[in-house]
């Protein structure tokens, strides 16, 4: 099993926890930048959430 497979496995087993961390990180960065990069943060949040969702579906 390669490292990528291990990461996918961990993501799928802990998708709810990872999603929580992604949400909190996005909120924190948005607060720290006073909303100046809100659009970029939301795009990154969506991309990260999609990765977690895709790994969850593949398992």
From Swiss-Prot:
InterPro entries: Antitoxin_Rv0909/MT0933. GO terms for biological process: positive regulation of growth. It comes from the Bacteria. Keywords: Toxin-antitoxin system. Antitoxin component of a type II toxin-antitoxin (TA) system. Upon expression in M.smegmatis neutralizes the effect of cognate toxin Rv0910. This is Antitoxin Rv0909. It comes from Mycobacterium tuberculosis (strain ATCC 25618 / H37Rv).
């Amino acid at each position: 099993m390669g490292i990528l497979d291990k990461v996918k496995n961990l993501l799928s087993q802990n998708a709810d926890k990872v999603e929580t961390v992604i949400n909190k990180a996005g909120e924190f960065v948005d607060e720290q930048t006073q909303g100046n990069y809100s659009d970029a943060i939301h795009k990154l949040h969506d991309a990260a959430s999609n990765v977690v969702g895709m790994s969850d579906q593949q398992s």
